């Protein structure tokens, strides 16, 4: 299963959040919200602010694991440089991200609505994939 997160970095420049759109196997699913995008890499780790920095662009494996924090099974991005514990979950504002990717429908600048509904739909798609099919996300 191929996920693609297309960020709108230029429109969010100077803001505390980063908006984007998530596609699943080439079809738009919903909008996303992340912390502020900062131009970081393993060469520039000093610009990262824990819990307030969007992950770097790249292609990452995704697994579904139990999250003690959320009390349920959620997608977890693997091998993200300089980051650990990056999940895809519901939330409405950048304060809900804790560095993760939120799903929902954009309602205002930096605000998502219907997040639980979109998260449920997303999890249904993940659960419906053929057994053993890997999940990958490309973040642009």
Where would I find each of the regions flagged by the language model?
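Cell wall/extracellular polymer interaction/catalysis modules
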Residues: 1-135
